[in-house]
């Protein structure tokens, strides 16, 4: 089953300084970028634009509206019982280039 990029879908950042942290898609900017938030008070991921290739979409989803504030996202996560799930970071395997 292909995972759909949609508002409210929970994902894991796979690149950058926030790699391994979970976030929620708040808005779809275009076919390559989405707006995500942790929210920062919960996961440490601040609201920012992210390339779709730099996130791994999970099968969990929360019911939020497009462009929801961090407070609304936090409330939806707590109502769905996913606050503890969001706090746990995911270990990302780092691939180092092969050199001789």
Curated annotation (Swiss-Prot):
Keyword terms: Ribonucleoprotein, Ribosomal protein
Keyword Ribonucleoprotein: yes
GO cellular component: cytosolic large ribosomal subunit
GO biological process: ribosomal large subunit biogenesis; translation
GO MF annotations, alphabetized: RNA binding; structural constituent of ribosome
Keyword Ribonucleoprotein annotated: yes
Residues making up the signal peptide according to the UniProt record: none
Family, per entry: Belongs to the eukaryotic ribosomal protein eL14 family.
PANTHER family: 60S RIBOSOMAL PROTEIN L14, LARGE RIBOSOMAL SUBUNIT PROTEIN EL14
Protein name: Large ribosomal subunit protein eL14
